Amino acid sequence: MTNRIPIASPVRTAAIVNRYFVHAKKNLGQNFLVDLDAVQGIVRAAGIEPGDQVVEVGPGIGSLTEQLLLAGGKVAAYEVDQSLPEILANELPEKVDGQDLDQRFKLIMKDVLKADFATDLAGFFDLSKPVKVVANLPYYITTPIIFNLLESSLDFTSLTLMMQKEVAERLAAQPGSKAYGPLSIAVQTQMSVDLALEVGHASFMPQPKVDSAVVVLTPLEKPADVGDRKQFNRVVKLCFAQRRKTLANNLKTLLPDKEDREKLLADLDLDPRQRPEQLAISDFIRISQAIAEMNK
């Protein structure tokens, strides 16, 4: 069916909720977007243009999906809620730019954390071309999804993600700030981070207790050479194990011998009294590489 009122509006969302007896499921972190300006802001931040291949995570009732399609995107969406396929089939436009919906939209009923992108998208996307990822992420699973996408084989030009504002601030945090930590470092060694817009809690139905923000992550032309990434991430996490402790104290797990710790920090010209949030990303890379050398 064709509707003039956008799905991303309180009136249309309420009508869908009543028609299908659907509700936002807390266990899936669902909150329906009912602010068209916010949704269109996400689409603009993602730079969606006609012909773009878009992977969406968690389409819900289609608030964002509809606007991605209207902007010209070809959308493959991952969803786990079995109550939503009927709603999406009925409520998204039957035709988009003269094409039937099934030519522009594919619903993949699978947890994105278990996605096999090459198989899932074959036959729908041209896999020789990159995609753009756009998502309104459930708060409780934001970080695992980000890491899953970064570590996947999916060829993407950008990740445009709405998430809890606090997590967005952690992604973009710089040394010296309270938000700076392992997540900031893990992401910033691979991606540029742009806080595109903030979305207040009143933009959702039901309203969450916290505000959200939209972040655009773009792969760096030259990602930082961190060596073994799992080892690097482990070193960083252990360095931040106790934020109020000094760097020397936090390194005890990795280097139990005090002389080893003192030598490593002296060789790297790092003050053992510093706290981890005072170190630049390059310092953590040097620490990780030095520990790897010591363990050979």
Swiss-Prot record:
Q: Which UniProt keywords apply?
A: Cytoplasm, Methyltransferase, RNA-binding, rRNA processing, S-adenosyl-L-methionine, Transferase
Record: residues binding S-adenosyl-L-methionine: 31, 33, 58, 79, 111, 136
Q: Which GO terms describe its cellular component?
A: cytosol
Cite a single GO MF annotation: 16S rRNA (adenine(1518)-N(6)/adenine(1519)-N(6))-dimethyltransferase activity
Q: Name one Pfam family in it.
A: RrnaAD
Q: What is its EC number?
A: 2.1.1.182
Which InterPro entries does this entry report, sorted A to Z?
KsgA/Erm, rRNA_Ade_diMease-like_C, rRNA_Ade_Mease_Trfase_CS, rRNA_Ade_methylase_Trfase_N, rRNA_adenine_dimethylase, SAM-dependent_MTases_sf
Q: What is its main location?
A: cytoplasm
UniProt catalytic activity: adenosine(1518)/adenosine(1519) in 16S rRNA + 4 S-adenosyl-L-methionine = N(6)-dimethyladenosine(1518)/N(6)-dimethyladenosine(1519) in 16S rRNA + 4 S-adenosyl-L-homocysteine + 4 H(+)
Q: Where in the cell is it found?
A: Cytoplasm
- Gene3D superfamilies per the UniProt record, alphabetical: Ribosomal RNA adenine dimethylase-like, domain 2, Vaccinia Virus protein VP39
- Top-level lineage group: Bacteria
The family classification in the record reads:
Belongs to the class I-like SAM-binding methyltransferase superfamily. rRNA adenine N(6)-methyltransferase family. RsmA subfamily.
General function of this protein: Specifically dimethylates two adjacent adenosines (A1518 and A1519) in the loop of a conserved hairpin near the 3'-end of 16S rRNA in the 30S particle. May play a critical role in biogenesis of 30S subunits.
Entry's PANTHER family?
DIMETHYLADENOSINE TRANSFERASE, DIMETHYLADENOSINE TRANSFERASE-RELATED
Tell me the protein's name: Ribosomal RNA small subunit methyltransferase A
